[in-house]
Amino acid sequence: MKERTYICCDLKSFYASVECIERGLNPLDTNLVVADLSRTEKTICLAVTPSLKSYGISGRARLFEVIQRVKEVNAQRQRNTPGRQFTGASSHDPEVRRNPSLALDYIVAPPRMAHYIDWSTRVYSVYLKHVAPEDIYPYSIDEVFIDATSYLQTYHLSAREFARKIILDILQTTGITAAAGIGTNLYLAKVAMDIGAKHVPADEYGVRIAELDEMGYRRSFWTHRPLTDFWRVGKGYAAKLEANGLYTMGDIARCSIGQPTDYHNEELLYKLFGVNAELLIDHAWGWEPCTIADIKAYKPENKSIVSGQILQYPYPFEKARLVIQEMADALALELVDKRLATNQLVLTVGYDIENLKGTAYTGEVTTDRYGRKIPKHAHGTVNLDGYTSSGEELLKAATSLYDRIVDKTLLARRLTLCANHLLDESSVPEDLPEQIDLFTDYSAKEKQKKEADTAHARERKLQETMLDIKKRFGKNAILKGLNLEDGATARERNNQIGGHKA
């Protein structure tokens, strides 16, 4: 089989770069964060420019962390300033570094998600100038994989030259700088970009490109820490591995070839991670058999639609119940729009840390990703009588499930509602034949069925009318009464994409 060459391209601090460019500023030397100031200081920063990151600020910091770190930097600068007084402040980083009498400042830009999607489309059009769509896999709004194998000979370029050609075209067309990782498989390309490119000096255009093959990966990254730097290794995975004495990808690779009598062997990994251990072992060795063609050809056995949100503040039982009803109603409209039906709902409600402050809560406690103690989330499933996209039925089922699984005394913060086992409406099975008995009034039953069918048809017509109005005049052009109640979130979320301002 011919060895393939993959390129993983990532737009540097994409949202922040867009905001800088539109202000006529250089994204590489302007201190800017993209965050919603209308929320609390706990709001997450969606992007941070490279110059601001250089002060020790994470790319996904909370706004209060940015504020705190900038205060620390300025306190240190002020101690070294003549007269210990600043003469001004600047968000232009070279100016700040040249002039010790200036305070470090930064711009807070509100997110504009729809605008970033437009910019992402512009960047994608640049990729299409060089590569056919079947050889591109958009991994996220600011990241793509490219199968460059067949293009290197066509363009008479090396993989590095081809990647640089694309990146410079993006820079010239949009003003956005990108980084790239090149690998002999998708995993190695991703690792080269995520980890390798960070340690490569930037060229005169700020471009960083790193390359990896299997042996290079083992030489350079088998001892790399932390494990969470690697693709698909989250904090939970890393904690399990480290609890069992596995701290690096090299440790995992050695564990996978351990003898049955050894503590560290392949069986341990399967015991810890089940079938996912196979992927972890492959990645430890730098293997990845999946291709872009495989990804595009993949058809999941089960389909689902998930709706989730983090509430702006802790909600009591009744208010969170209202939001769940909104979510169920919106989920039904999405099913109608996509001509799908579901027969199962899954609900998860995450509780807030406030529940453990000065209360007599004695239930099960767990730890969140920040190491804070919180009550264990509520989780439940309800199977419907049949496949449906009826808002009335889904709202009733979701409300009943919520009432059954949620602790009425606790404050909710995270809500997730999932419609499972989706089928195209044309594929929904007919009602199964029924065993006749002597004690059922079938005429009354038939009458009930006709009335239900009429009600469903009437509701369906109403749903389709609402969808038509929303598409033509905006999602908030028509609302239900529950969307206007205190605590409802649908109106605000209709103006958002991914939970942030559109």
What are these regions (language model features)?
Residues 1-292, 443-502:
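Gly/Gly-Pro- and Ser/Thr-rich, intrinsically disordered tail segments characteristic of DNA damage-repair
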Residues 8, 229, 237-412, 427, ...:
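DNA-contacting surface of Y-family translesion DNA polymerases
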Residues 209-212, 227, 305, 382, ...:
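Short clusters of hydrophobic/aromatic residues that line enzyme substrate/ligand-binding pockets
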Residues 177-179, 346, 416:
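Residues at or immediately flanking beta-strands
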Residues 12-14, 38-42, 351-356, 422-426:
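Short, charged/polar surface micro-motifs in flexible loops or helix N-caps
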Residues 42-47, 207-210, 358-359, 377, ...:
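Short, well-ordered strand-loop elements centered on a beta-strand within folded domains, enriched
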Residues 18, 371-502:
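Acidic, metal-coordinating catalytic segment for phosphate/diphosphate chemistry
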